[in-house]
Amino acid sequence: SVGFKAGVKDYRLTYYTPEYETLATDILAAFRVTPQPGVPPEEAGAAVAAESSTGTWTTVWTDGLTSLDRYKGRCYHIEPVAGEENQYIAYVAYPLDLFEEGSVTNMFTSIVGNVFGFKALRALRLEDLRIPPAYSKTFQGPPHGIQVERDKLNKYGRPLLGCTIKPKLGLSAKNYGRAVYECLRGGLDFTKDDENVNSQPFMRWRDRFLFCAEAIYKAQAETGEIKGHYLNATAGTSEEMMKRAACARELGVPIVMHDYLTGGFTANTSLSHYCRDNGLLLHIHRAMHAVIDRQKNHGIHFRVLAKALRMSGGDHIHSGTVVGKLEGERDVTLGFVDLLRDDFIEKDRSRGIYFTQDWVSMPGVLPVASGGIHVWHMPALTEIFGDDSVLQFG
């Protein structure tokens, strides 16, 4: 007789394993699961584990040709969310072998690629990931990190100051360069291309790069300080992006910029490697993040996107401002700011940190407070972010 019955089987028979002891090499995920009415939470959690690892909707004969026990994701714990009806945190452990080394792209394709459209779930949110050292060690991480950046800039013991050039679209390259010069000459450390400044008809990228480089050198000569302008290398193809980064390097400027979510993790990791090889700092903007992280019960929390960026590589990343927001936001924001900067971060549910994260020796990323802040926010910002941050006005 055949060794299995055809037909749809309950996932929880195979993928819900409450007695499982997680391994130090497992990637652990915390999902906020909202099952459809009538679907038990164990089945919903197991469905997530199955569909994001080895499972499919039925048993197939090729299952016998591999070791499911070795390769399957396991839902090992489920807890109800306090104050929410029919919402659960499902903890899933993935064996390390399911993931390609050094690829954030593959990690996300596996963990969040398919499960979010699942019929048994009303909504699903990835709240946190625990990246084991065995996996994080396969990534280069940030091109330089906080300490090396301070050494390159010769600026210590204070937050770095920057601003975004406005109006963000419509200036000619020459006038744009003028604005950069005035800001840097006036005392800022950095100026920034807006995230939507790429290479538009009114200002092509190469013209902007040349005028900004001129502004940087002039301001440096007059102030005796090292200055920078985040030249946005984001482009329509990754080859064009690398070409723009190479041009920035030839001009001798210290830093380039990338929109990592719209540009994609594959392009970002390539650019990050190039930046380390060529001594460029890399500023990361998170355009499109709110599409993914704004809903409370569906999507991916920004702390996961921040962890992914630290692995893919970036020296700065925009991380919200806290100022003027609700107090609760403050703890959660500081939670992922610590995840960006520190080596070792303890589990702390009050700050939204579901797992203890050990980055071992991976360099840190400077959090950038940007968007709607002005000089009156200064005391609050320095108190919240401390010295290792970039405060960007305008």
Curated annotation (Swiss-Prot):
Keywords: Calvin cycle, Carbon dioxide fixation, Chloroplast, Lyase, Magnesium, Metal-binding, Methylation, Monooxygenase, Oxidoreductase, Photorespiration, Photosynthesis, Plastid
The record's free-text note on cofactor binding: Binds 1 Mg(2+) ion per subunit.
Cofactor field: Mg(2+)
Residues recorded with modification N6-carboxylysine: K192
Binding site for Mg(2+): K192, D194, E195
GO BP, one annotated term: reductive pentose-phosphate cycle
Site feature: Transition state stabilizer: K325
Reaction(s) this enzyme catalyzes, per UniProt: 2 (2R)-3-phosphoglycerate + 2 H(+) = D-ribulose 1,5-bisphosphate + CO2 + H2O; D-ribulose 1,5-bisphosphate + O2 = 2-phosphoglycolate + (2R)-3-phosphoglycerate + 2 H(+)
Example of a GO MF term: monooxygenase activity
GO cellular component annotations of the record: chloroplast
Pfam families: RuBisCO_large, RuBisCO_large_N
Cellular compartment(s): Plastid, Chloroplast
Taxonomy, superkingdom: Eukaryota
Enzyme class, broadest EC rank: lyase
Modification sites for N6,N6,N6-trimethyllysine: K5
Binding site for substrate: N114, T164, K168, R286, H318, S370
Entry keyword annotation includes Cell membrane: no
Subunit structure: Heterohexadecamer of 8 large chains and 8 small chains.
Function description: RuBisCO catalyzes two reactions: the carboxylation of D-ribulose 1,5-bisphosphate, the primary event in carbon dioxide fixation, as well as the oxidative fragmentation of the pentose substrate in the photorespiration process. Both reactions occur simultaneously and in competition at the same active site.
Miscellaneous remark of the record: The basic functional RuBisCO is composed of a large chain homodimer in a 'head-to-tail' conformation. In form I RuBisCO this homodimer is arranged in a barrel-like tetramer with the small subunits forming a tetrameric 'cap' on each end of the 'barrel'.
Family statement drawn from the similarity comment of this UniProt entry: Belongs to the RuBisCO large chain family. Type I subfamily.
Protein known as: Ribulose bisphosphate carboxylase large chain
